[in-house]
Design a protein with these regions (language model features):
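Active-site acidic short loop of glycosyltransferases
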Residues: 22, 87-90, 112, 199
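Flexible "cap/lid" loop of the alpha/beta hydrolase fold
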Residues: 101-144
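Conserved alpha/beta-hydrolase catalytic His-Asp/Glu region
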Residues: 134-197
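N-terminal cap/lid segment of alpha/beta-hydrolase-fold proteins
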Residues: 1-9
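Conserved HGGG/HGGXW glycine-rich cap/lid loop of the alpha/beta-hydrolase fold
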Residues: 8-65
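Residue in the alpha/beta-hydrolase core beta-strand immediately N-terminal to the catalytic nucleophile
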Residues: 57, 92, 115-118
Length: 199
């Protein structure tokens, strides 16, 4: 499914099911440098359980157009525009890593629509190693390997290799997508206040 927010194309996985107001709605938010691809199995499962599932690509990520947004606050405002455009009145958000920060800030600014937040490998703040940011800013593809190495235990093996290398294919994408995301995560400082407001 494609639609337009702020004159820019937004992509969400089309599950083949029509929106049903009687069914619960869930938005899946990916992490830094990622896309809807990381939620493929989750999207299928939730759709099969009769959820209205919206698996979004953030601006500049995956199949969504535009530049990557530079702050978590801007991403939360964008998310609200998406939710309003889709006509969702009540929803849950399942979020991974950076997506958790976006979900927190959304809950802080727009609590009335939100029923639940599920964190997957998330926290109220995500400080990022300066060396990783510098590597990503330089467009070095090694930043993808380091991100996976620091994020997972040594014994963890990925079938088909590092999933980030399947999403980010060039030094330009590393600079313009991953680096921007990492800086946004590192700069976000409102998480603790947002957590305290969740009831």
């Amino acid at each position: 499914m494609e639609f337009t927010i702020d004159n820019t194309k937004v992509f969400s996985v089309d599950t083949g099911e029509k929106f049903n107001e009687k069914n619960p709605s869930v938005i899946l938010l990916h992490g830094s440098g990622q896309s809807h691809v990381v939620w493929s199995l989750t999207t299928q499962f939730l759709s099969g359980e009769n959820y209205n599932v919206f698996t979004l690509d953030l601006p500049g990520h995956g199949n969504s157009e535009g530049a990557s947004l530079k702050s978590i606050e801007d991403m939360a405002l964008w998310l609200n525009k998406v939710i309003e455009h889709l006509g969702i009145k009540q929803l849950s958000i399942v979020a991974h890593s950076q997506g958790c920060l976006i979900a927190l800030e959304y809950a802080n600014k727009f609590p009335k629509n939100l029923q639940k937040i599920v964190f997957v490998a998330g926290s109220y703040e995500i400080p990022v190693n300066k060396s990783l940011i510098d590597l990503a800013l330089s467009g070095d593809m090694e930043s993808l390997n380091l991100m996976m190495k620091w994020g997972y235990e040594k014994s963890k093996q990925f079938i088909g290799g590092n999933p980030l290398q399947k999403i980010l294919n060039s030094p330009r994408e590393v600079r313009e997508v991953l680096a921007v995301d990492l800086i946004a995560c590192n700069n976000y400082k409102n998480g603790l206040n947002a957590v305290k407001k969740i009831t």
